[in-house]
């Protein structure tokens, strides 16, 4: 499949079948993420894969509690990939202090998108999750001081046929050459 076709086909999946995801497929997705570029090549990411009911429930009961309960649907996914980062890396500290940019967020976005695109190619569904209790989730995962839980990705076999994709803005509304114009 051509890359742009893959990107066009991919959509967020929130309902998964009970069919387990093969560990080799999970490893393939993480391998795609491992190869992602990062600021100064620091590769700040650490991937924690939750692929059994008990682990997902224990994690979800913490990370999706209180105001974050709207993300509890993810507890029905056969896999949740937690993307944690090491904050003490030099590129992260300098970027934040000098430029005000948290490069680890960009790095996680690139690596995570590699995961969801690889999953799509393998016939798996996925959904980014940004609404979770980061501190409680980090504690449930056993993250160390100086680490942060940055993102989650639910992964599995879609339970339903894919719905019609949401419309995206046309290029002429978002693309500008040489200078932004209204």
Model-identified regions with their sequence ranges:
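A short N-terminal beta-strand-loop micro-motif at the entrance of redox/enzyme domains
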Residues: 13-28
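Glycine-rich, charged/polar anion/phosphate-binding loops
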Residues: 31-35, 65-68
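Small-aliphatic-rich amphipathic alpha-helix that forms the alpha element of a beta-alpha
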Residues: 33-34, 81, 96-140
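Glycine/small-residue-rich phosphate/adenosyl-binding loop
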Residues: 41-111
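A glycine-rich helix N-cap at a beta->alpha junction
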Residues: 67-77, 143-164
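Short secondary-structure boundary segments
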Residues: 85, 131, 157
């Amino acid at each position: 499949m051509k890359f742009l076709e893959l990107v066009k086909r991919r959509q967020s999946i929130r309902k998964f079948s009970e069919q387990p995801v093969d560990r080799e497929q999970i490893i393939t997705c993480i391998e795609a993420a491992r190869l992602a570029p990062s600021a100064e090549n620091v590769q700040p990411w650490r991937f924690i894969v939750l692929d059994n009911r008990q682990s997902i429930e224990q994690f979800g009961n913490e990370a999706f509690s209180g105001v974050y309960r709207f993300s509890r649907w993810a507890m029905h996914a056969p896999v949740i990939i937690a993307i944690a980062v090491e904050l003490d890396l030099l590129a992260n500290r300098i970027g934040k202090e000098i430029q005000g940019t948290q490069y680890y967020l960009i790095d996680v976005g690139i690596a995570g998108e590699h995961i969801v695109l690889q999953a799509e190619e393998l016939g798996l569904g996925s959904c980014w999750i940004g609404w979770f209790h980061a501190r409680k989730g980090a504690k449930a995962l056993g993250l160390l001081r100086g680490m942060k839980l940055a993102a989650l990705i639910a992964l599995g076999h879609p339970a339903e046929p894919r719905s019609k994709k949401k419309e995206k803005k046309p290029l002429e509304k978002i693309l500008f050459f040489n200078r932004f114009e209204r």
